[in-house]
Amino acid sequence: MEHKYLFVAVDAALKAGEEILSIYTDPASDFEIERKADHSPLTIADRKAHVTIATILDETPFPVLSEEGKHLEYDTRRNWDVMWIVDPLDGTKEFIKRNGEFTVNIALVKAGVPIIGVIYLPVKKELYFAGQEIGAYKLSGITTLEDDATLDKLVAASVPVSYTHLRAHETRGNL
């Protein structure tokens, strides 16, 4: 299960990053800034990234809990054993400042424990991905997922980001 959904999460993060960058790099964009109930900013990039991610993740059997999505009561959410947890644009204030310090965050969580995690830094084109069975990795220079992508290809093109996973990576002959 894990590997299939890792690719779904990576694809969603990369496509959301593309949406975000199209707004971020537009010198005429005012970002259409609004304020949420807690007075934190919300931009058109937040909203578009949310729609992009939700559209992709809605094709899976798991519900999506997103910072920018509709807020469901805890009584509904507490019965979800497996769910996606998403922050489509983490670092909205940094996005507004145009300092490049923002990410797209997606996790698949089962019984409160993350089993897949993806963090994408669109400006730097850096993707961090992790899974319980595969370890944690960093992939640089990525903007799209190739049609013939496999877990082995993704891992081989990446750098392990934890010592435990570095040893597993070396054992597979990827270093």
Residue ranges and their predicted role:
Residues 142-155:
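Conserved beta-loop-beta connector loops within the AMP-binding
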Residues 1-86:
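N-terminal subdomain of lithium-sensitive/metallo-dependent phosphomonoesterases centered on the IMPase/IPPase/PAP
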Residues 83, 153-158:
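Residues that mark the start of a beta-strand
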Residues 77-137:
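DPxDG-like acidic metal-binding loop motif
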Residues 159-163:
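Active-site rim beta-loop-alpha module in soluble metabolic enzymes
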Residues 136-139, 158:
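Short hydrophobic/aromatic-rich beta-strand segments that constitute the beta-sheet cores
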Residues 164-173:
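Conserved small/polar residues in nucleotide/adenosyl-binding loops
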